[in-house]
């Protein structure tokens, strides 16, 4: 079976709050072959404790919530087989999926608030 490339455009935003906060995306687009592991990177900067979120927007559909980290276990399981790992020392919250599907082609949004 031939593998089709999966394109994902990662976009980032911050939820407004009183303190300085930001998210950064080192890659504008991620391309993986179907069946390969997928990682969409997100790093953040906050002055307090972070609340981190991932959202997805599939073609011709509205924004959908995938997962969030507020406190507790650093590995967060989300919808559609996605998970994200909170790493405080590296200030990262990378979205991962062990085996990407063509249907995963979408816009992915990382968000932070403190």
Swiss-Prot record:
Major subcellular site: membrane
Keywords, ordered alphabetically: Adaptive immunity, Cell membrane, Disulfide bond, Glycoprotein, Immunity, Immunoglobulin domain, Membrane, Receptor, Signal, T cell receptor
PROSITE patterns the UniProt entry points to: IG_LIKE
SUPFAM superfamilies according to UniProt: Immunoglobulin
Disulfide bonds: 42-110
Domain Ig-like: 21-114
GO-annotated biological processes: adaptive immune response
Glycosylated sites: 87
Signal peptide bounds: 1-20
InterPro entries found in the cross-reference section: Ig-like_dom (IPR007110), Ig-like_dom_sf (IPR036179), Ig-like_fold (IPR013783), Ig_V-set (IPR013106), TCR_variable_region (IPR051287)
Subunit structure: Alpha-beta TR is a heterodimer composed of an alpha and beta chain; disulfide-linked. The alpha-beta TR is associated with the transmembrane signaling CD3 coreceptor proteins to form the TR-CD3 (TcR or TCR). The assembly of alpha-beta TR heterodimers with CD3 occurs in the endoplasmic reticulum where a single alpha-beta TR heterodimer associates with one CD3D-CD3E heterodimer, one CD3G-CD3E heterodimer and one CD247 homodimer forming a stable octameric structure. CD3D-CD3E and CD3G-CD3E heterodimers preferentially associate with TR alpha and TR beta chains, respectively.
Function (record text): V region of the variable domain of T cell receptor (TR) alpha chain that participates in the antigen recognition. Alpha-beta T cell receptors are antigen specific receptors which are essential to the immune response and are present on the cell surface of T lymphocytes. Recognize peptide-major histocompatibility (MH) (pMH) complexes that are displayed by antigen presenting cells (APC), a prerequisite for efficient T cell adaptive immunity against pathogens.
Name of the protein this chain belongs to: T cell receptor alpha variable 3
């Amino acid at each position: 079976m031939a593998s089709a490339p999966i394109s994902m455009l990662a976009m980032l935003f911050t939820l407004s709050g009183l303190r300085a906060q930001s998210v950064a995306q080192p890659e504008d687009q991620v391309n993986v072959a179907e069946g390969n592991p997928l990682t969409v990177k997100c790093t953040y900067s906050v002055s307090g404790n972070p609340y981190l979120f991932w959202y997805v927007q599939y073609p011709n559909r509205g924004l959908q919530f995938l997962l969030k980290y507020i406190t507790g276990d650093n590995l967060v399981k989300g919808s559609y087989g996605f998970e994200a790992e909170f790493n405080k020392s590296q200030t990262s919250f990378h979205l991962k999926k062990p085996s990407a599907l063509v249907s995963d082609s979408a816009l992915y949004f990382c968000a932070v608030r403190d």
